[in-house]
């Protein structure tokens, strides 16, 4: 049976004189094969008392399982993002059921942004931009160009990057959810 797939998630971290800005956004399209099943899915969430932002790309049911597991790790480790991410990937790699999950997470708090994969990777981007999912490459390119050539906020860059990805990627729509810290 085919799984629900297709999305774009982008996160931008930007330094300003007032401090770091971070935002994560995602589109709302869910596809089953080549059919759009839903256009208003919320793939970006606030976790751990609103202090952590998370977005997922991949199989929808798998991603919700990972959200729950990740939030439990955040609670266990008092909101320490990197520690919770490493502990989640350890479980993801060693648990027979979790190992079959097909999803990626983009997570961020006030100081750190990470990509968490089912391969056991916990990656911190060098430039503060994370982009995952089918339209990720388009959104990442747009975000990098906007960071280098504008004074837009992190949230504005995320919104514009998602819009650009939505114009190019057939698995990305224009219904966006964006959260910022």
UniProtKB/Swiss-Prot annotation:
Compartments reported by the entry: Cytoplasm
The active site lies at 7
Catalysis performed (reactions): ATP-dependent cleavage of peptide bonds with broad specificity
Q: Does the keyword Iron apply?
A: no
GO molecular-function annotation terms? metal ion binding; threonine-type endopeptidase activity
**GO biological-process terms attached to the record:** proteolysis involved in protein catabolic process
Classification via Pfam families = Proteasome
Q: Which GO terms describe its cellular component?
A: HslUV protease complex; proteasome core complex
Disulfide cross-links: none
InterPro entries attached to this UniProt entry: ATP-dep_Prtase_HsIV_su, Ntn_hydrolases_N, Proteasome_sua/b, Proteasome_suB-type
Q: Which of UniProt's keywords are assigned here?
A: Allosteric enzyme, Cytoplasm, Hydrolase, Metal-binding, Protease, Sodium, Threonine protease
| Record comment: activity regulation | Allosterically activated by HslU binding.
Assigned EC number: 3.4.25.2
Residues reported to bind Na(+): 166, 169, 172
Give the HAMAP family listed for this entry. HslV (MF_00248)
Q: Which PANTHER family match?
A: ATP-DEPENDENT PROTEASE SUBUNIT HSLV, METALLOPROTEASE TLDD
What does the record note on quaternary structure?
A double ring-shaped homohexamer of HslV is capped on each side by a ring-shaped HslU homohexamer. The assembly of the HslU/HslV complex is dependent on binding of ATP.
- Role played: Protease subunit of a proteasome-like degradation complex believed to be a general protein degrading machinery.
Q: Which family does it belong to?
A: Belongs to the peptidase T1B family. HslV subfamily.
What NCBIfam families does this protein map onto?
ATP_dep_HslV, PRK05456.1
- Protein's recorded name: ATP-dependent protease subunit HslV
Source species, please?
Variovorax paradoxus (strain S110)
Starting at the broadest rank, the lineage of the source organism is: Bacteria, Pseudomonadati, Pseudomonadota, Betaproteobacteria, Burkholderiales
């Amino acid at each position: 049976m085919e799984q629900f797939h297709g999305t774009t998630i982008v996160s931008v971290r930007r330094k300003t004189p007032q401090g770091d800005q971070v935002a994560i956004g995602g589109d709302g399209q869910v596809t089953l094969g080549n059919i759009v099943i839903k256009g208003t899915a919320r793939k970006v969430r606030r976790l751990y008392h609103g202090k952590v932002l998370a977005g997922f790309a991949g199989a929808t049911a798998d991603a919700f399982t990972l959200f729950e597991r990740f939030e439990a790790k955040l609670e266990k480790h008092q909101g320490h993002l990197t520690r919770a991410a490493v502990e989640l990937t350890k479980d993801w790699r060693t648990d027979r059921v979790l190992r079959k999950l097909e999803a990626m997470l983009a997570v961020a708090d006030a100081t750190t942004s990470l990509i968490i994969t089912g391969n056991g990777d916990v990656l911190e981007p060098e430039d503060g931009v994370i982009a995952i999912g089918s339209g990720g490459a388009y959104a990442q390119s747009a975000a990098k160009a906007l960071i280098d050539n504008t004074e837009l906020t992190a949230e504005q860059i995320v919104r514009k990057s998602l819009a650009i990805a939505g114009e190019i990627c057939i698995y990305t729509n224009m219904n966006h959810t964006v959260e910022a810290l």
